C-alpha cells in the first residue's frame, strides 16, 4: 500500500488540520439538519432568513464528507493494524446510530444509517481491492467482487451518502499515487453534492504529515461525531422544540 504525497512550499495542511476543518464543517451542517430542518422548520415557526441560514450551513457542511473520505484513504494506507482500525469504525458506527436517528429523525429510523457505516464499508472495499490483485497490480476478480459486496451492503443498509459515498472513497483510493489525479477524481465523484468538490482545494494543500495532536485529541476526533449529534438531539427534541 502506498500513496503519493507532494511536499508543498508555503501554505500546507496537516492531517490534523484537515480533521479540525472537517469537524467544524460537519458541525455547521448538522446544526442546520437537526436544529433547523428537524426542529424549527417542523414547528412551522420560522422566518425566511432561517431558510437562508439553513442553506448556508448545509452548503458549508458539504465540505466535510469528501475530507473524511480522503483521510480514510490515508488512514488505510498508513495503518499498522487494519483489523483494529476496522473494529474501531464498527464500534463507533454502532455507538452513533441511536444519536443519529434521534438528532435527525426524532426517533429510531431504520431507513438511513450513519456515516460511520459508510466509512467502514469503504475501508472494507479498499481492503478487498488491496488484498486481491493481479501480478500487474490491478484489482483481481475476488477484489472487485468484495468491493461490489460493500456497495450492495451500502445500498441495502441505506448508509449516509449511499453508494455514491463508496464510489468517492474508491476513486480516491485508486488515484492515490498521483495527487493531481486524486483531487480531480475526488472533485468529479463528489459532484453529487453542491460545493463538495471545493473540499479538494483544501486536500491539495495536504502536507502528507499527520500533524501534532495528543492521544486525547486523536480519540476526540472519533468521539466528536456521536457526541455532537447527541447534544443536537437533546436540543432539538428536549429543550428547544418540545
Question: Which role fits each region the language model picked out?
Answer:
Residues 1-242:
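Alpha-helical transmembrane segments and their immediate juxtamembrane cytosolic regions
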Amino acid at each position: 500500500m502506498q500513496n503519493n504525497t507532494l511536499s508543498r512550499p508555503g501554505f500546507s495542511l496537516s492531517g490534523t488540520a484537515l480533521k479540525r476543518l472537517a469537524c467544524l464543517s460537519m458541525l455547521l451542517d448538522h446544526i442546520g439538519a437537526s436544529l433547523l430542518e428537524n426542529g424549527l422548520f417542523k414547528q412551522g415557526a420560522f422566518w425566511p432568513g432561517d431558510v437562508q441560514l439553513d442553506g448556508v450551513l448545509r452548503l458549508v457542511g458539504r465540505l466535510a464528507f469528501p475530507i473524511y473520505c480522503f483521510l480514510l484513504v490515508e488512514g488505510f494506507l498508513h495503518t499498522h493494524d487494519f483489523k483494529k482500525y476496522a473494529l474501531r469504525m464498527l464500534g463507533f458506527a454502532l455507538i452513533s446510530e441511536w444519536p443519529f436517528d434521534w438528532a435527525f429523525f426524532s426517533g429510531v429510523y431504520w431507513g438511513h444509517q450513519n456515516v460511520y457505516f459508510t466509512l467502514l464499508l469503504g475501508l472494507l472495499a479498499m481492503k478487498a481491492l488491496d488484498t486481491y490483485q493481479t501480478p500487474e497490480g490491478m484489482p483481481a476478480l475476488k477484489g472487485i467482487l468484495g468491493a461490489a459486496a460493500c456497495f450492495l451492503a451500502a445500498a441495502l443498509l441505506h448508509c449516509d451518502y449511499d453508494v455514491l459515498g463508496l464510489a468517492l472513497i474508491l476513486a480516491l483510493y485508486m488515484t492515490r499515487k498521483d495527487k493531481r489525479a486524486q483531487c480531480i477524481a475526488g472533485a468529479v465523484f463528489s459532484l453529487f453534492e453542491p460545493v463538495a468538490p471545493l473540499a479538494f482545494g483544501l486536500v491539495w494543500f495536504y502536507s502528507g504529515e499527520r500533524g501534532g495532536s495528543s492521544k486525547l485529541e486523536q480519540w476526540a476526533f472519533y468521539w466528536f461525531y456521536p457526541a455532537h449529534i447527541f447534544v443536537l438531539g437533546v436540543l432539538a427534541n428536549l429543550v428547544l422544540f418540545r
